[in-house]
C-alpha cells in the first residue's frame, strides 16, 4: 500500500 504520513509500511 501507499505510505502514510511519515510512515512507510511494506506493500
From Swiss-Prot:
Principal subcellular localisation of the protein: secreted
Organism: Austrophasma rawsonvillense
Protein name, per record: Extended FMRFamide-10
Entry keyword annotation includes Cell cycle: no
Function: FMRFamides and FMRFamide-like peptides are neuropeptides.
Localization: Secreted
Family stated for the protein in its record: Belongs to the FARP (FMRF amide related peptide) family.
A biological-process GO annotation: neuropeptide signaling pathway
Key words, A-Z: Neuropeptide, Secreted
Transmembrane regions listed in the UniProt entry: none
GO cellular component entries: extracellular region
First and last residue of the signal peptide: none
Amino acid at each position: 500500500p501507499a505510505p502514510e504520513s511519515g510512515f512507510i509500511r511494506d506493500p
